Amino acid sequence: MQSIGAKILAATKERHPNHHHPRLIMTEADFARLREKRGEGAYKPMLDKTIAEADKILDLPPRKYEIPDGVRLLVTSRAVLTRLTHLCYAYYATGEEKYAARAVVEIEATVNFPDWHPRHFLDCAELCAAIAFAYDWLYDYLSEDLKAAVRAAIIKNGFNAVMEEYNNEPEHKNVLDPNRGYRWYQDKPGDNWKMVCNGGLTLAVLAIFDEIECDLCETILNHAYDDTYEAVRKFYDEQDGTYSEGVGYWSYATRYLSFYSSGLQTAAGSDFGLTDWIGLARSPYFLLSMSSPNYIGFNFGDAVESKITSPLFSWCAARFDDPALYAIRKKDILEGKSDFVDVLYFRDVPEVPLKDMPLAFGRPKADNATFRTSAAPDALFAGIHFAKNNAYHGHKDMGTFILNIGAKRFFVDLGMDNYNLKPYRGCYRFRAEGHNTIIFNPSPENDQAWEAGCTTDRFFNCEDYGFAIADMSAAYPERRAVRGMMLDRPSKSVLIQDEIECKTEDVIRWSAHTPATVSIAEDGKTAVLDMDGTKLFAEILTDGVFEITLGRADENSPVVQPAPRESDPTPAPQKDNEGISRLFVLLSGKERHRIAIRFTEMTDAEIAPAEVKPLSLWS
């Protein structure tokens, strides 16, 4: 029986005999189509921007082999990928040799690197993708000597290097090369590295396999396909499309999955079922559900606060016959926010309205829940995150929440920090104290348990309101903590309620981070948050009073600057949280606490009184 790798190689040879190129995502017909479309509709700003970026590259020196943080060549790898893809497209679009000639300079520099830094294999994989695209798209322009040099570099720096990963089984970890870092192939279920590394190496194989004497090609394709096939089915939840690493890493992982799948399609005529997965098809709607009315995502874990409407929406539109996703991406393109990946996938087709999105997202046993008052641009939107703290790219953030009124985010997730911090898990943004949740006895030692996890226990939504409840006790040893979020649509309010069992001497701190201007009433029971005239009314419905750390949320944190270590006497500073205030409530002296805090959008309507019910009676 033929292996999947053998099938891919045979199909590619049949479709592209006599070393025919281009065959990686872009074909001759695709480049011709873009030349014809260059002045039309949304194609014009997208393609004009791509050529303008290529023009900027012409006078730049080629990238050097530099590892500025001592860990990653990744900045160079990504720059090479960006440069080569832009230059290649500009050459096809204009026919001007200056773009191809400048690409040759970049290729020559890259193939002469001492290696492609397999110790941090993402660096190697992204360079494999970059050089594969350039070799394929410029095949008829490159000299025979340079093509031979490219093939040799890919074999040495890519194929031989990846076999160290594929051959090094867990029981022999680091035997072959003890200097390797993260063992992404052995890691199960793993993370975005599987898409990037397997995808980059597959592109490299497809670019050169028919011109080399190398018995590794089939082996690499076999390992890459099997590993990625499994990862797709674990990373993209079958029920609702939730991506396991959150909204930020969805784009990175799916970008390389799209390269992998589309490269197989144009080379071999099929991706052999790699992306035939309903969870992947549903994943753009996970992003839409996890974003505010202006498409800014809920950036829990290692993510930044940014728009979720990436170029991969266009790939999903084509792959899963969902043209409504093109329209979402088109808005960004018309605003001048295109990316080179748009060139690969975007189609300016007649707009199809997005299917009606539910006003709530979640279910029992899910990691996240979101609610909104309506589908309008000025709607109130709130989201809450549970999940496993030690998930890939997770933080100690169980129970954290965000809240928007329209485009204004009143309660924020501070997002990721510098991965080179030592220890990263000790930085403010990683710890529970840097999130919108509760902690007991604030100190460097006391936070949420790293190994803890939970999912939604109860989820409900109807016309007027919706709620999600989860038991977070696993995060707090020897304590019990249950948190609920309820959004009430008629009153435009969000209730965060915690029910806690603890020790009498425990100090509980409830916190939420905000960029708003905050005014606390004299009695401390209410506060008004103001963002450029849009106001949110906060009220404590139970014990406690509001306090605030103004303008610098982490000011009283004992871990804002990690202590230097002998191996790193000058650690990188943590990111600046200037301009973010921490609104908090401190409670102590009892074994049982109920903390109910309601946030209501301030309008001309009178704010109705609230009733506090035990979470067990929410229905």
Segments predicted by a language model, with ranges:
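CBM-like, beta-strand-rich accessory domains located in the C-terminal region of large
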Residues: 417-619
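Carbohydrate-active enzyme catalytic cores, enriched for enzymes
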Residues: 182, 208, 248-411, 461-464, ...
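Low-complexity, Ser/Thr/Pro/Gly-enriched N-terminal "stalk/linker" regions
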Residues: 2-68
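Active-site lining segments of carbohydrate-active enzymes
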Residues: 64-71, 132-246, 344-356
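Well-ordered alpha-helical scaffold segments within catalytic/enzyme domains
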Residues: 21-40, 81-97, 109-117, 127-146, ...
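Terminal accessory carbohydrate-recognition/targeting modules of carbohydrate-active enzymes
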Residues: 2-18, 22-23, 31-33, 363, ...
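Long, repeat-rich segments with strong aromatic
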Residues: 221, 225-268, 369, 373-375, ...
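Solvent-exposed loop and edge beta-strand segments that line ligand/cofactor-binding
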Residues: 23, 63-80, 112-125, 167-196, ...
